[in-house]
Design a protein with these regions (language model features):
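Post-Walker A helix-loop "phosphate-sensing" segment adjacent to the P-loop in P-loop NTPases
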Residues: 64-75
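Walker A/P-loop nucleotide-binding motif
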Residues: 43-59
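Conserved AAA+ ATPase "SRH/arginine-finger" region at the nucleotide-binding site
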Residues: 145-157
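Short regulatory helix/loop adjacent to the ATP-binding pocket of P-loop NTPases
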Residues: 128-143
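C-terminal helical "lid" of AAA+/P-loop NTPase domains
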Residues: 179-183, 190-204
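A short, basic N-terminal segment
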Residues: 1-37, 42, 204, 208-232
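Conserved P-loop NTPase "ATPase switch" module shared by AAA+ and STAND
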Residues: 84-109, 116-125
């Protein structure tokens, strides 16, 4: 950090996670369609997968609000009993389901939900067939779930995503900044999140608005950090 930059306190921002806040495009239309189709799924579970920051967690929140399901992350499952996890609900969304802390907990949760006629939404980075599962019974159930991919964003969605991320942080940006970023940034959800976060932090540190020069600085710094991390 340069001497001219101020210390920035980390204040949490609250992303908008409602249905109307979700940005729909060709890359995620299938996933949105399955959420809208609930409860008329082909089986007890579906598995939504895609790259980091692609909206899996957002969709899980949307489905939770619509279905009354419980939302929990894979690492938080622990060895808890299925009725304890559900707490009276009949359905559950498991975010980061491919980063489990206890496979048996998910297996019991799956079986319990299927038995009581509920639904299970699994969200992860990879297709369920590629999850490293040791329990054969769990692997077969996950593999049988309807797999729904969220693909990398197109330019239209990427632009809309930048606008939403800036809005979530109450940052005002001009069209020139958006055009500059879209012409030069990596085409990924994670890159959009990293860029907006860096612009927010640097703008606060230097007490500057989000401008093209600030965007240029952030892109250069992120590229430098990426090159450094990629070195042996």
């Amino acid at each position: 950090m340069s001497a001219g930059r101020q210390l920035v306190l980390e204040f949490p921002h609250r992303p908008a996670l409602g249905k109307t806040d979700f940005l729909v495009s060709d890359c995620n239309m299938d996933a949105v369609g399955w959420i809208d189709r609930w409860p008329d799924w082909q089986g007890p579970a579906i598995a939504v997968y895609g790259p980091p920051d692609c909206g899996k967690t957002h969709l899980a929140h949307v489905w939770r609000n619509r279905s009354g399901a419980v939302l929990i992350s894979g690492p938080e499952l622990g060895d808890r009993a299925a009725p304890d996890i559900l707490g009276g609900a009949d359905s559950c969304a498991v975010d980061d389901a491919d980063a489990l802390s206890d496979e048996e907990a998910l297996l019991h949760l799956y079986n319990h939900i299927a038995e009581i006629g509920g639904k299970l939404l699994l969200a992860g980075r990879h297709p369920p067939a590629r999850w490293s599962l040791k329990l054969a019974d769990l692997a077969s159930r996950v593999a049988a779930a309807q797999a729904v991919e969220i693909r990398p964003p197109d330019d239209e969605l990427l632009g809309a995503l930048l606008v939403k991320l800036f809005y979530d942080r109450q940052l005002t940006v001009s069209k020139d900044v958006l055009v500059y970023l879209l012409a030069r940034m990596e085409r990924s959800f994670a890159a959009a999140s990293a860029i907006v976060d860096a612009l927010d932090q640097l703008g606060l540190a230097e007490r500057r608005g989000v401008t093209v020069p600030l965007a240029r600085t952030v892109l250069n710094e992120l590229e430098t950090n990426s090159d450094t991390n990629g070195e042996d």
